[in-house]
Amino acid sequence: MKKQRLVLAGNGMAGIRCIEEVLKLNRHMFEIVIFGSEPHPNYNRILLSSVLQGEASLDDITLNSKDWYDKHGITLYTGETVIQIDTDQQQVITDRKRTLSYDKLIVATGSSPHILPIPGADKKGVYGFRTIEDCQALMNMAQHFQKAAVIGAGLLGLEAAVGLQHLGMDVSVIHHSAGIMQKQLDQTAARLLQTELEQKGLTFLLEKDTVSISGATKADRIHFKDGSSLKADLIVMAAGVKPNIELAVSAGIKVNRGIIVNDFMQTSEPNIYAVGECAEHNGTVYGLVAPLYEQGKALASHICGVPCEEYQGSAPSAALKIAGIDVWSAGKIQEDERTTSIKIYDEQAGVYKKALFVDDKLAGVILFGDTRDKQRLLDSLLKQRDISIAKKQIIEPETSGPLFESMPSSETICQCNTVTKGAIEDAVHTNSLTTVEEVKHCTKATGSCGGCKPLVEDLLRYMTNSEYTKPASTPSFCSCTDFTEDDIIAELQRRPFTNPAEVMNQLDWKTKNGCSTCVPAIQYYLEMLYPGFVQPEPATEETCILIPQMYGGRTNAEQLRTIANIIEAYSIPDVSITHGQRLKLSGIKPADLPNMKKDLKMPVYTNEHRHALQSIKACTCGQNRSIQQLAAQIERQLEMLPLPAPISISLSCETDCTEAALQDVGAIRTQAGWDIHIGGVRGTHARSGALFCVTENEDSTAGMIKGLIQYYRETAHYLEGVHQWIDRLGIVHIREVLFEEDLRAQLLESLQTDLSLIQNPTVETGAYKKG
């Protein structure tokens, strides 16, 4: 089949991240052609200030070498700009008069420095700070001149100013506002930062409006609205950026400040997408790395036809990249009538912390002088955790040892590149890594904005500590593959697989048909990802079982009479009572099963439902009918729900006559409400489950049990029992999730969506499709 052609206009970080995501999802789908205006492969523009400050070299900031493009069969045209899009013919035209057709086009033209529209702005010696060429020019100018001025005291302006100072120049920073970094810091943090930078030798001219630049052959003086002026041999414009939308405008694509896109980064023109600093989503143009990478994932999934979450916007976070200064902020920073706040200011230690809350949910954070807990606070911000959790994190930050000791392997260290603690640990052990640079090349952590570099350094130090325990290596899932179970799950989420055979083929299984370990596991995970679409499996058993459903363990004469007639009519050889208080009919001929189901006229479970939730054992002592009613209610709501492994649930009175404490999930009715226990084990190695929580009434009990089951479904491995799952995740973590109302509500909503599909199934022959 002929490949579609995917053309990328722009060879920067956002565009190339899209291509990387596309290659992960389906490396054979597109012929990829990339045009880049600059004469370089993709590099990290964010770290140009680090080059200026002497913290990195130009080679260090290269993200994708020419070999990477060649390895993936990508055609790269450097130093060539797309100047026109013919939407009727689906063609792009470049400044070298090259015409190329496309099936899909991604516009990733980025942004340009905002050069103030004032007299003299075009003189020699006035620069933006955006490209490698800009960086090289500034480094060259610093060798010949002494006085520099930076217009703009945002992130880029301050980083450039410190870089020029590192090169030996006297630097003045000019800013139109009363405080520096006003988009990221409040007045207190801005004042503290300014004081620290002044101690390093920078001079600040605040509330200054630049009106002109003068000089004979080159710029040598800046003039202000108040009549004053400043001598400057070198002037850097860092007063913001403007999205490059000219290409879209000329093609008739809808624009505002940026190119307007939807939640999948599609423009108003079919088959044309936009991403990065040129794109505008819901009225916002993002200039930070993490949001652009999040956009790239949504775009790549949509362009490859893979079901994915829509891009919903991002909570911006920013860290100042200046050695020896710890400043970080995220989300909302200015107070208003809707906000409450927690502030900590230790003047002697030079530490300032502020957390803003809206409706008792964390909405924004500023950290100055101590940013150790920024990753946890960012996680709390993204999940909108309530005030009690965030308050503890901001008041009592953990030192690196306990922080990493308690941090799960799944927690993200590098937000830009979605690199987890576990991925870094695995890379360090597998490849004997010892430096941050080696970790970056192996995992991409620290390779984008650089904000996680201190955290990665701390993790490396912690891993050399005597208290560090090396995590056990994860074996491959089975002998058919080298993938671990988590690897397989990640691939299933990433790619549009249609059946187990396709999974095994595309993931290079060593055996053609898999084995009894991997095939049912893949089947289960696909059903979890696409609920309600079940691939029929050939019957392998010589006989079948059938369990009539009796909600809450209760029945009546009519049901029993019907069951008895069925037993006689079909000569059922074996009838028994299950642990879950149900009748089990065994030894049924497969050919008889369809007619038996019709004759029973009641819900049934058969072999194919072996891991579905079948029954909830309820107290039969007669003290309280509400217990049986609650069991029946939950059974009806969760009927046919697929589970990773068989699960036992029991509801009991205060005497625990159903041994609820020994079940996977058990709820015991008390005078105060309900005690919910989880993780019990029956049999020769019996153990009571741990008390998970206490609920007030039947509704809250049902909600907690259903939320718990859904979280188990979403995070447990195939055939992983509840007690094993608890041991792996930790009961504290599970409590944190289920006790938070918003997260529990999300779980219950997901459960209801899954149930609506499961209980109204569509049978596909060999295919899984999302409804």
Curated annotation (Swiss-Prot):
Pfam families, A to Z: Fer2_BFD (PF04324), NIR_SIR (PF01077), NIR_SIR_ferr (PF03460), Pyr_redox_2 (PF07992), Rubredoxin_C (PF18267)
Superkingdom in the source lineage: Bacteria
Cofactor or coenzyme needed: FAD; [2Fe-2S] cluster
Expression induction or repression: Positively regulated by TnrA under nitrogen-limited conditions.
Binding residue positions for FAD: 43-79
Positions of [2Fe-2S] cluster binding: 414, 416, 449, 452
GO molecular function: 2 iron, 2 sulfur cluster binding; flavin adenine dinucleotide binding; heme binding; metal ion binding; NADP binding; nitrite reductase activity
InterPro entries, alphabetized: BFD-like_2Fe2S-bd_dom (IPR007419), BFD-like_2Fe2S-bd_dom_sf (IPR041854), FAD-bd_OxRdtase (IPR050260), FAD/NAD-bd_sf (IPR036188), FAD/NAD-binding_dom (IPR023753), FAD/NAD-linked_Rdtase_dimer_sf (IPR016156), NiRdtase/SiRdtase_haem-b_fer (IPR005117), Nit/Sulf_reduc_fer-like_dom_sf (IPR036136)
Entry-linked CDD domains: NirB_Fer2_BFD-like_1, NirB_Fer2_BFD-like_2
Cofactor note: Binds 1 [2Fe-2S] cluster per subunit.
The entry's keywords: 2Fe-2S, Electron transport, FAD, Flavoprotein, Iron, Iron-sulfur, Metal-binding, NADP, Nitrate assimilation, Transport
Annotated GO biological process: nitrate assimilation
Lipid metabolism in keyword set: no
Function summary: Required for nitrate assimilation.
The protein's name: Assimilatory nitrate reductase electron transfer subunit
